[in-house]
Amino acid sequence: NTRCLGSFVFLWGQKEERTPTWFSMFVEDKVDSLPLKGEKTPMVEAMQRVWTGKELDETAPIVRGMTIDGKSAIDNVRIKAGTLFKAEVSVTDKENDSLAYVWEVLKEATVLGFGGSYEPRPERMGDVAVSDKNVYETMIKVPGEYRLYVYVLDNTGFVSTANIPFQVID
């Protein structure tokens, strides 16, 4: 449109999106035990493409879906406390880069901000797992509401993320 004078990307001031991965241009870079360095998300790639009109030589991995025991988020995943469960993420990468998978389970957010107010990062359950596999197994012994996150990193500075909420029941 010839009437468009330009565009810009902005940040509210701090993260307030219920999860550490929603609507981010870059992933976190200073979180204990997470091997993340502020890698670029697909939104950075999209903005570069829109602003330059050119395809990039390197692109972010594409997450096609994520399941826990074969169920997606829409299936209201429930797991019995102390039961081993298996998560799987389906990913493609246009350039066939080698991929690394970083998995973590966080408690579901309970401190919810409003209108851009600060929300603390939810508490982590267990250890961060780093692997070259798109499959992750773990168990949670304490009933409650949780969210499993995966960060899929290529070797070019891009990352894609997915998460799935689940409930652990007695």
PLM feature segments, named:
Residues 165-170:
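Short beta-strand edge segments in extracellular beta-sheet folds
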Residues 1-114:
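Substrate-binding clefts and catalytic carboxylate motifs of secreted carbohydrate-active enzymes
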Residues 92-96, 143, 155-157:
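Short solvent-exposed strand-capping/beta-turn motif centered on an Asx-Ser/Thr pair
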Residues 158-164:
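Extracellular and select intracellular beta-sandwich modules with Ser/Thr-enriched
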Residues 81, 142-143:
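Surface-exposed loops/turns
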Residues 100-137:
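Exoplasmic/lumenal beta-rich domain surfaces
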Residues 144-148:
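Exposed beta-strand face motif in extracellular beta-rich ectodomains
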